[in-house]
Amino acid sequence: MQLPEDATKRAPLALVSIILPVHNAEQWLDECLMSVLQQDFEGTMELSVFNDASKDKSRAIIEKWKVKLEDSGISVVIGGHDSPSPRGVGYSKNQAIAQSTGSYLCFLDSDDVMMPQRVRMQYEAAVQHPASIIGCQVRRDPPDSTERYTRWINQLTSDQLLTQVFTSHGPTVIMPTWFCSRAWFSHVGPFDEGGQGVPEDLLFFYEHLRKGGGVFRVDHSLLLYRYHLCAATHSVLEMTIWTHRVHFLEEQILPHWKSFTIWNAGKQGRKLYRSLTAASQHKVVAFCDIDKNKIRKGFYCHEDSQERPKPKVPILHFQAAQPPFVICVKLDLTGGEFEDNLKSLHLQEGRDFVHFS
């Protein structure tokens, strides 16, 4: 006997709830929802959709799939609003979670496609790692978009999932692949509901790490991850993310270091130095580089400083510099030259250096 919809919402029936925020996603939804139907997970599953003021045919597509999914044993909860403007991804995810019942949460973006094994394999990992965010490897569509970023997502070691959390790439397992227990989400969450321009995934990820959460990646490609200019990611300003990253670096790493060197005497390294608090700036003993012209100059003078005399920071060759380093050189861009230079120093990532590129 099928329970009426309101009873389904109350009863804790699902083991896994798939959390799907939707805003004007008509061109992707059929493929996305078909991938929910095709999951090979044998436990109970629920799809929780929150329609964030879509003005296209998204709602009709969701209603059509509700019938197909429920016929195959996947319960569907649909929430939403039709205000003139959307309330944002953070709000939509929080609403979809609040109306769902599953003990585990599997996050899905409406423009992505899950492989049939995704829920099963991530559920198995989540049971083993109850205080972790579980991610997975991805396949990019189109395949040649963001090649460096995709390699980074797929190839980080298990240690780097925790040491490379300060880079401009953001969370070391990407939000559309997240899977975790409801209990852990409740301990960390909810998502920031600031709306467009707020990196709600990054803020949640940082809070997760502050609370001692782990990061685990299932090393199978379980998601087709689409790249297109309408994606919500593009609405977040780079400077907003930069500010959050600097703050997190100053909170998590710099208190443990008496002094440090910034690796890159160019634009990015100087920008980081200028963004630091005065207390952190005083810990910077040098910049280092391989550029002979920068090294010949001898020092960087912080012209905007209110201090007198203005701070002058030496610029050294990287082999003459002292760790620990905050590295502001982009990875995977110099044909391996930078990586070889770093390797030649025999340092330990996380202890002797962190990447901030």
Curated annotation (Swiss-Prot):
Q: Name the family the entry cites.
A: Belongs to the glycosyltransferase 2 family.
Which GO MF terms are attached to this record? tRNA-queuosine(34) galactosyltransferase activity
Question: Which species?
Answer: Rattus norvegicus (Rat)
Q: Top enzyme class of this protein?
A: transferase
Catalytic activity reads:
queuosine(34) in tRNA(Tyr) + UDP-alpha-D-galactose = O-5''-beta-D-galactosylqueuosine(34) in tRNA(Tyr) + UDP + H(+)
* Pfam families (UniProt xref): Glycos_transf_2
Recorded protein name is Queuosine-tRNA galactosyltransferase
Biological role: Glycosyltransferase that specifically catalyzes galactosylation of cytoplasmic tRNA(Tyr) modified with queuosine at position 34 (queuosine(34)). Galactosylates the cyclopentene hydroxyl group of queuosine(34) in tRNA(Tyr) to form galactosyl-queuosine(34). Mannosylation of queuosine(34) in tRNA(Tyr) is required to slow-down elongation at cognate codons UAC and suppress stop codon readthrough, thereby regulating protein translation.
Q: What PANTHER family is this protein classified in?
A: GLYCOSYLTRANSFERASE, UDP-GLCNAC:BETAGAL BETA-1,3-N-ACETYLGLUCOSAMINYLTRANSFERASE-LIKE PROTEIN 1
Recall the taxonomic lineage recorded for the source organism: Eukaryota, Metazoa, Chordata, Craniata, Vertebrata
